[in-house]
C-alpha cells in the first residue's frame, strides 16, 4: 500500500479563528490530528539499560497517551516495571514506571512521570528511551506506542 508523508502539523476543521459567538459559523473548531508512533525495538526482561525505541517526537508536541503493548508475557513477573524517558541518562522522566505483571496483556496505559511532562515536549525533537526493571521476570517482551498532537505548542494554564 502506498503512503503519503506530510510535514505537518495536520489540522482539521472549518473555522480557524473565533470572530463571533455563533457555533458552526464564527467560533473556532479546528483541532490537531493525533499522530502515533510504535517502537521498532522490543523492551524485554533483559532490557536493563536505557534503550532507544526508534520513536522521535517532534518539537512542541503534546503527548496524549503512552501505551505498553505486551507481545510476550513477562513470565514469573510480580514487580517488573517499564519506564520511558527522553535520554539515556534520564530514562524515566516522560512515562512513570508502570508495573507489568505475569498475566498483563495490555495495552497498559502509562502515566506521565511528573505534572506537565506531556504538555509540551519543548523546542527540540526528542528521542524516547525505555528501561525495564525485571526483578523476577524470566521472559517477556513489549512494544511502546505513543500518541501525540504534533506542534500543539501548549502553554501552562
Briefly describe each language-model feature range.
Residues 2-157:
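Surface-exposed, low-hydrophobicity beta-strand/loop segments enriched in small/polar/acidic residues
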Amino acid at each position: 500500500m502506498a503512503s503519503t508523508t506530510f510535514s505537518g502539523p495536520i489540522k482539521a476543521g472549518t473555522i480557524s479563528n473565533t470572530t463571533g459567538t455563533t457555533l458552526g459559523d464564527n467560533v473556532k473548531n479546528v483541532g490537531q490530528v493525533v499522530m502515533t508512533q510504535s517502537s521498532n525495538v522490543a523492551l524485554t526482561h533483559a532490557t536493563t539499560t536505557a534503550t532507544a525505541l526508534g520513536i522521535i517526537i517532534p518539537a512542541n508536541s503534546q503527548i496524549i497517551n503512552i501505551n505498553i503493548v505486551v507481545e510476550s508475557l513477562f513470565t514469573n513477573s510480580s514487580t517488573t516495571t517499564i519506564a520511558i524517558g527522553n535520554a539515556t541518562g534520564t530514562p524515566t522522566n516522560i512515562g512513570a514506571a508502570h508495573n507489568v505483571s505475569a498475566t498483563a496483556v495490555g495495552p497498559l496505559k502509562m502515566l506521565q512521570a511528573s505534572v506537565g511532562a506531556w504538555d509540551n515536549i519543548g523546542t527540540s525533537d526528542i528521542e524516547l528511551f525505555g528501561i525495564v526493571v525485571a526483578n523476577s521476570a524470566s521472559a517477556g517482551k513489549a512494544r511502546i506506542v505513543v500518541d501525540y498532537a504534533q506542534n500543539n505548542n501548549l502553554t501552562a494554564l
